[in-house]
Amino acid sequence: MTKKKAKVASNTIALNKRARHDYFIEDEIEAGLSLQGWEVKSMRAGKASIGDSYIIFKHGEAYLFGATIQPLSVASTHIVCDPTRTRKLLLNQKELASLFGKANRDGFTIVALSLYWKGPWAKVKIGLAKGKKLHDKREDIKDREWKVTKDRIMKNAQRG
């Protein structure tokens, strides 16, 4: 008998699908996160959400705001677990200066795109984003529907 292949676990913890729908993503950067122990355990259990999260700058540092990490039910009682606390992003000074300059342009913001594991470290992919207008969103939907229709036509043509 052959051995069954072990399933490879996905490294992705959470995705922000709404960001790609609501914004044009100009640039993407990988950043580390400063986390507490209970947050790491909760993220390993898949209890993280970055749906409405974005990046703010305070005192020359970047922080992830709006991300939610729900504590496990078996978490210690002597530690106060705040699921929505702001978490510091670990970036070098050159990246911070570049992001700060780009974010201060008119109409640009920085949003969290995905949260994932890279080895033993939790990373967040952040993107420099510009808001989409309603007609841009409709155009994206039309393009997506046309791609599906085109693929269906090609598949049926090959069957023939």
From Swiss-Prot:
GO process terms (BP): trans-translation
InterPro entries: SmpB (IPR023620), SsrA-bd_prot (IPR000037), SsrA-bd_prot_CS (IPR020081)
Transmembrane segments: none
Pfam families to which the protein is assigned, alphabetical: SmpB (PF01668)
An example molecular function term from Gene Ontology annotations: RNA binding
Family of the protein in this entry: Belongs to the SmpB family.
Name of the featured protein: SsrA-binding protein
Species, as recorded: Histophilus somni (strain 2336) (Haemophilus somnus)
Name of the encoding gene: smpB
